[in-house]
Amino acid sequence: MQIQFLGTGAGQPSKARNVSSLALKLLDEINQVWLFDCGEGTQNRILETTIRPRKVAKIFITHLHGDHIFGLPGFLSSRSFQSSEEQTDIDIYGPVGIRSFVLASLKVSGTRLPYRIHFHEFDVDTVGQVLETDKFTVFAEKLDHTIPCVGYRVIQKDLEGTLDAEALRAAGVPFGPLFGKIKNGQNVTLEDGTEIIASDYISPPRPGKVVTILGDTRKCHASVRLAVNADVLVHEATYGKGDEKIARKHGHSTNMEAAQVAKDAGVKQLLLNHISPRFLSKDISQLRKDASTIFEQVHIVKDLEEIEL
């Protein structure tokens, strides 16, 4: 599981940073990629990665500001330029309005897609679980921005325990079909009458990863709830230390507020994005340094950077 950042800037593209989008790469887990937000130029950034558009199975939108959705019609259109056998449906999750935005854009531009879009709109005031599969659950909760906006909590379900192959061999179990039966939880009896209890050779289930991805927001309790004990928290840092008043006025957070959320939630790692174009390279290191006085495991991400989870 990896997160690759396709756009880490705030408001408008800059030479160094595109606007908001990231890919949660679940290729090893379910052979899919999930996008979170799709700002202008997202498909251009994807061309600079190994991500195949047909692998993008789900798109989660945090809110309907342009820097988070203006790349969506173009990406959906370009995704259709694949061979017919590669066409797969796509699911789009987001606040009420995302469906009308996408359909109006496609209609006005005369775009016809050879695959289906399944929309999952929700009211941000009542949203909760938005997706459950056999391996993942996704929750959303309303944040505190200038328009309806949510954050997402992606929970990987517990992973199967691992088979202790060395112990099995020591117990006289020949490598082959019996290993498979034991891994599936079946007890087996060897030719000499020895009974092998499967549970004795399988480790307990391992907890899956928890990834929290927030949209634009002021510091709020919902951010902490979404991030409790997460392995990774992706949080905006549009403003820097001392800019709390202007950040609140415009519905955003400072690096210091993001760090406090991470500390309060007990996350393992904080990744800061949605960086204002006014911050130069020398300012970025100071943003990280200031935030680290509150939460040490903090990193300011760059476009195309990939984080292994």
UniProtKB/Swiss-Prot annotation:
Cofactor: record remark: Binds 2 Zn(2+) ions.
Catalytic activity of the protein: Endonucleolytic cleavage of RNA, removing extra 3' nucleotides from tRNA precursor, generating 3' termini of tRNAs. A 3'-hydroxy group is left at the tRNA terminus and a 5'-phosphoryl group is left at the trailer molecule
Record CDD domains: RNaseZ_ZiPD-like_MBL-fold (cd07717)
Annotated Zn(2+) 2 binding sites: 67-68, 216, 274
Self-association state and partner proteins as the record states: Homodimer.
Name this protein carries in UniProt: Ribonuclease Z
Native source organism of the sequence: Streptococcus suis (strain 05ZYH33)
EC number from the UniProt entry: 3.1.26.11
Leading EC class: hydrolase
